[in-house]
């Protein structure tokens, strides 16, 4: 996966943002099964039927950073893993629907956390979404344990990620 991301990113004129960022050794983050985030891809780790994997791609293009994270199911996954992946996607979609000028980041976080909880899951507290643009990680920080009408005001032109880490267990890493 890392080789493909590096090759395609550079062929399209981009730079893989994670590569050498704070010592990170690869071009993409891959987190398998119960690993929360920022996993380091390895040729020694072979994906198995039933695994779930998060692929977190970030690119620098024309001086601007982008960041996108997606979950994938490998082969025949258990009903528990399938539900986790589906609810996580729903959390992202519900969060995105809350984004509009003059709303609040707390609106986004609250709906994400509520949907996860309604389905028996938690959302990690320590890591959240973030702004991206001229820097890899910039303001605002998007937490998911928030209340509607609180946190930063969303204004036109802001760019940020909605990347909730939804867990089947504790809200801690």
Question: What kind of region is each of these model predictions?
Answer:
Residues 1-173:
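Active-site neighborhoods and metal-handling regions in enzymes and metal-associated proteins
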